[in-house]
Amino acid sequence: MVKVYAPASIGNVSVGFDVLGAAVSPVDGTLLGDCVSVSRADSFSLQSAGRFVDKLPAEPEQNIVYQCWQRFCEAVGETVPVAMLLEKNMPIGSGLGSSACSVVVALVAMNAHCGRPLNDDQMLMLMGEMEGRISGGVHFDNVAPCFLGGMQLMLEENGIISQTVPGFDDWLWVMAYPGIKVSTAEARAILPAQYRRQDCISHGRYLACFVHACHTRQPALAAKLMKDVIAEPYRTRLLPGFADARQAVGDIGALACGISGSGPTLFAICDRQDTASRVADWLTQHYLQNDEGFVHICRLDTSGARLMMD
């Protein structure tokens, strides 16, 4: 049997709409991500378990994991009979890369089960394609960090899909999911078709300078540049309490705060454990809306999708 875990991811990371993503994992060892187990079988089967299993489609054929199995078999040119078990530990429509997580973990598990017939580039192309079935268009800002780990910048030039942007070891990423769902399609539809020239210039400056600050090891500058002029001004209205939360965590001492993907999860970056704990406490008390919500203090997950030992 092969068992694979893939971590949650932050799409956009505020400053890099559709071109920057980061994988995160809780510091306390909680699995904030999906697991898939694959075993030999006479015929295909898919079972689901986990905290958020009731949010999955009732019919296995509608599950993206089943579709990933189908597409993987097409890619390798043979039907591979397996029994798959999906452990859904990620809420759907959360802004944590839930669909990307299921795509990555399913394809990595199948590839490992079959002796890795596909290389990383082939896998990443498949992942982007499968993610596109759910999000409506091929993009890699969740699947790339989920698969490869760390913070990934989408290049999509010279045959290179993404490359790593170095993060900062002392950054703690406080992730707060309020327990409500935001449709990615709705969050995209609310964005304007055209942007002002000044916004385009600002966006380019923030992203270029952020990547520069990461490579030249300037954490204070990098945090200062984590500004979103593309999505956040419009998506805030879809996220009850986000504006107040951003102000509050900044007052506590967070270096930056933004929307994870299309929301409703937010992230706040801190460089001290005591600050992160205070931010987490405030978000737990004021940003969560029901029992499905949660807050985790995380670090960048530099490993990405990986085999697990039972």
Swiss-Prot record:
Key word Oxidoreductase present: no
**MF GO annotations:** ATP binding; homoserine kinase activity
Q: What is this enzyme's catalytic activity, as reactions?
A: L-homoserine + ATP = O-phospho-L-homoserine + ADP + H(+)
Kindly list the cysteine pairs connected by disulfide bridges: none
Give one GO biological process term.
threonine biosynthetic process
Stretches that traverse the bilayer: none
**The keyword DNA damage appears for this protein:** no
According to its UniProt entry, the function of this protein is described as: Catalyzes the ATP-dependent phosphorylation of L-homoserine to L-homoserine phosphate.
Please give the NCBIfam families that the UniProt record associates with this protein: PRK01212.1-4 (NF002288), thrB (TIGR00191)
Q: Which family does it belong to?
A: Belongs to the GHMP kinase family. Homoserine kinase subfamily.
| Official protein name in the record | Homoserine kinase
Task: Please give the organism.
Answer: Sodalis glossinidius (strain morsitans)
Lineage per the UniProt record: Bacteria, Pseudomonadati, Pseudomonadota, Gammaproteobacteria, Enterobacterales
Tell me the gene name: thrB
